[in-house]
Amino acid sequence: MTSASTKVGEIFSAAGAAFTKLGELTMQLHPVADSSPAGAKWTETEIEMLRAAVKRFGDDLNHISCVIKERTVAQIKATVKRKVYEDSGIPLPAESPKKGPKKVASGVLSPPPAAPPPSSSSVPEAGGPPIKKQKADVTLSALNDSDANSDVVDIEGLGETPPAKKLNFDQA
């Protein structure tokens, strides 16, 4: 199995060969010396084929760039979320959804599942398992909220023992 760096090297070698060929084709289209009959060999169809190939190449590179940017943004958001949870002393949820809400057959987004109401007591009910007190979740949407105090996130009520903590992301 080849390493990632070897694969990237092979990709750039192939790209170099492709750009060399593109340079040769461009020189045939626009010869330096007027005496060269190579420019006359190109038909409109061939020129259009070359134009389409170069456009597809650019479009494919743009698509790859978008995929990488989206993945990078998702990784950054996940890292920030994990850091916020760690800094606030809240355990990270065991199951974090990989995708947004699922689409139903009608094409309408299904509402997120309703969370059970928080219990104000950690005393177990008769015959049932002990019920833990629910903690408020700090979500990325709350962190990214552009309403009042967007630079400060108040995480009151996350723990009963320590006083309320404030996160300020503008500090260096």
From Swiss-Prot:
The keyword Phosphoprotein applies. Keywords: Chromatin regulator, DNA-binding, Nucleus, Phosphoprotein. Residues 87-172 are annotated as: Disordered. Residues 120-130 have a biased composition (Low complexity). One of its GO terms (cellular component) is nucleoplasm. Gene3D superfamilies: 1.20.58.1880. It is found in: Nucleus. The modification Phosphoserine is found at residue 96. Residues 38-86 form the SANT domain. Its main location: nucleus. One of its GO terms (molecular function) is identical protein binding. Residues 110-119 have a biased composition (Pro residues). One of its GO terms (biological process) is chromatin organization. Component of some MLL1/MLL complex, at least composed of the core components KMT2A/MLL1, ASH2L, HCFC1/HCF1, WDR5 and RBBP5, as well as the facultative components BACC1, CHD8, E2F6, HSP70, INO80C, KANSL1, LAS1L, MAX, MCRS1, MGA, KAT8/MOF, PELP1, PHF20, PRP31, RING2, RUVB1/TIP49A, RUVB2/TIP49B, SENP3, TAF1, TAF4, TAF6, TAF7, TAF9 and TEX10. Component of the nucleosome-remodeling factor (NURF) complex. Component of chromatin complexes such as the MLL1/MLL and NURF complexes. This is BPTF-associated chromatin complex component 1. The lineage of its organism: Eukaryota, Metazoa, Chordata, Craniata, Vertebrata. The gene is BACC1.
